[in-house]
Regions:
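Negatively charged, low-complexity tracts enriched in Asp/Glu with abundant Ser/Thr
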Residues: 1-47, 63-96
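Amphipathic beta-strand/beta-sheet edge segments enriched in Tyr/Trp
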Residues: 50-58
Length: 96
């Protein structure tokens, strides 16, 4: 039962979360800003995992704010949606 749920959540990560993250990456690249966005993915023995790290830097290159959502197959779709929205709001805040 648990493995089935992990599999469904991993499919959601592939079909919904990753495309949204790629869309956010394109926006960061398209618009001049002090933002940095890193994304990594892995599958650890059948457990999917996506980590993202966004930060904004000041004129001296010092990090002034961060957002670090992690998407793990044990999270519900609702939890993952909340995290992607948090990242999206962070990016919008510093892209303006």
């Amino acid at each position: 039962m648990i493995q089935e749920e992990y599999k469904k959540n991993e499919e959601y990560m592939n079909s919904t979360i990753l495309p949204k993250l790629q869309e956010i990456q394109r926006e960061v690249l398209k618009n001049p800003s002090k933002l940095t966005l890193d994304i990594s993915v892995r599958n650890n023995d059948g457990e999917g995992y996506i980590s993202s790290f966004a930060c904004v830097r000041d004129f001296a290159g010092e990090i002034t704010d961060t957002c670090y959502p992690r998407f793990i197959c044990v999270y519900s779709k609702e939890e993952m949606d909340e995290l992607i929205n948090e990242l999206d709001e962070f990016i919008k805040k510093y892209s303006a």
